[in-house]
């Protein structure tokens, strides 16, 4: 399985993600840059975190209008795997590959801390090494991480099993007081209806080794590699 890690002007988690794939997972990986138009030689495309194009207009808006973004869209339409982390998640919603939008945090502040995530669907390509109800400890770092989707769309996503992670406490209880950004229904990560495109605001690449405080983020990569 060959990975591509996307690099836009302002990306800042690209090397972290590359390191996890190359040195921990020991998989073939290359950087691809914002002017790239051809992703045919890759099996998985990862959009890392950062502040692409300085978050001008709104996070992900300009990145979604690059040649690379069009290539990512075409790649996803072929059923290949696409993962968006933080700013990558924002870009995927701007592209229309994932439902909803990411709005400024409810407190209008940048939030950087460890959070707990509850697995909502263990049957996806990104969670099949996990069990429903498992709790992962993974950090967040964002200003615009408040996931929003209209109520009717949320209902359809629930029915389709598109919600993969929710913010919760250490015991796995989903509560308003542990929601770090005001996301609707405590949502932290979702996938498309087809099941090949996934986005999350927390950073699994920052929870990849015990020395960092957690290796829970590796389970997402291991799930994908078990395909």
Curated annotation (Swiss-Prot):
What does the record give as the reaction this protein catalyses? Answer: N(2)-formyl-N(1)-(5-phospho-beta-D-ribosyl)glycinamide + L-glutamine + ATP + H2O = 2-formamido-N(1)-(5-O-phospho-beta-D-ribosyl)acetamidine + L-glutamate + ADP + phosphate + H(+); L-glutamine + H2O = L-glutamate + NH4(+)
Hydrolase as a keyword? Answer: yes
Which residues does the entry assign to the active site, renumbered to this chain?
86 (nucleophile), 203, 205
Sorted keywords for this record are: ATP-binding, Cytoplasm, Glutamine amidotransferase, Hydrolase, Ligase, Nucleotide-binding, Purine biosynthesis
Which pathway does this polypeptide act in? Purine metabolism; IMP biosynthesis via de novo pathway; 5-amino-1-(5-phospho-D-ribosyl)imidazole from N(2)-formyl-N(1)-(5-phospho-D-ribosyl)glycinamide: step 1/2
EC number of the protein: 6.3.5.3, 3.5.1.2
User: Which Gene3D superfamilies has this protein been placed in?
Assistant: 3.40.50.880
SUPFAM superfamilies membership: Class I glutamine amidotransferase-like
Q: Which CDD domains match?
A: GATase1_FGAR_AT
What InterPro entries does the entry give? Class_I_gatase-like (IPR029062), PRibForGlyAmidine_synth_PurQ (IPR010075)
Among the Pfam families in the record, one is: GATase_5
- Taxonomic superkingdom: Bacteria
Assign the protein's first listed, main location to one coarse class: cytoplasm
Residues forming the Glutamine amidotransferase type-1 domain are 3-227
The record's subcellular location field reads:
Cytoplasm
One GO MF annotation is:
phosphoribosylformylglycinamidine synthase activity
GO CC field? cytoplasm
What task does this protein carry out? Part of the phosphoribosylformylglycinamidine synthase complex involved in the purines biosynthetic pathway. Catalyzes the ATP-dependent conversion of formylglycinamide ribonucleotide (FGAR) and glutamine to yield formylglycinamidine ribonucleotide (FGAM) and glutamate. The FGAM synthase complex is composed of three subunits. PurQ produces an ammonia molecule by converting glutamine to glutamate. PurL transfers the ammonia molecule to FGAR to form FGAM in an ATP-dependent manner.
Q: How does it assemble?
A: Part of the FGAM synthase complex composed of 1 PurL, 1 PurQ and 2 PurS subunits.
UniProt-recorded name of the protein? Phosphoribosylformylglycinamidine synthase subunit PurQ
- Where does this protein come from, organism-wise? Aquifex aeolicus (strain VF5)
